[in-house]
Amino acid sequence: MTENIKDALSYAVELAGKENKIIRSETGKEYFDSNEYDLQELNPRKYAPILELQTLKSLVDYLKSDNDFISDRKIVVVVDSYQKVSVYDQVDFENGKRPQLVSVKATVPVIPFSNWRDQEEFNIMLQSMFINDADRNLVLDFASHLKIEKGAEVQDNGISQMATVRDGVASLAQAKTPNPVTLRPYRTFNEVEQPASQFVFRINKSANLALFEADGGKWKLEAVESIANYLKNELASNKKITILA
């Protein structure tokens, strides 16, 4: 009997202790002080999960729609990079947060720059991952006709290279590698023009080929600007949308 009374008293003390750990703020919110140092809000405000998209067109369609009453809200569209755009709601000052509504990430191929590839792999890469233009075709033609036999050497002065290429059906000739070349790989959203940038085209003694980026990343800034301009044009009628790049 004594033990039962003791257990009941201990339980009552424990309940009283827990009650004391619940703190109410001036705004009416309740917090639980689990260890006297870490306040955890009871029943915090819930936010909808971030909507994940892959194209700029889908983002424009969503922002023009009446889903989630999005067309009536003041929102901020941020071009985070050449492959990512984020949409934020107005600041929730009560909770100290800026809710993110949408995340758009471009689906682009992983292009193996600065890596040596044999002729077949290199040709496939050029045709499948680059816009069809003059310099791409020039590099493709050179790579397709390249021939380095055992004992042959690639002449290199550090800037350009001389290599043996097939000239006609059977004859061979020395040709200088095209350098530098201006190419447009698929690196950003398809709705905007793929930015052009310079590359150094190199060959090694095994007839492997590689492209090395040579513009210092300038193309990334151009891509961000193109994305921002696209969104500004498509969403010009909605004055509640702020676009930042």
Show where each model-derived region lies.
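Generic detector of well-ordered alpha-helical segments enriched in charged/polar residues
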Residues: 6, 10, 57-60, 120-127, ...
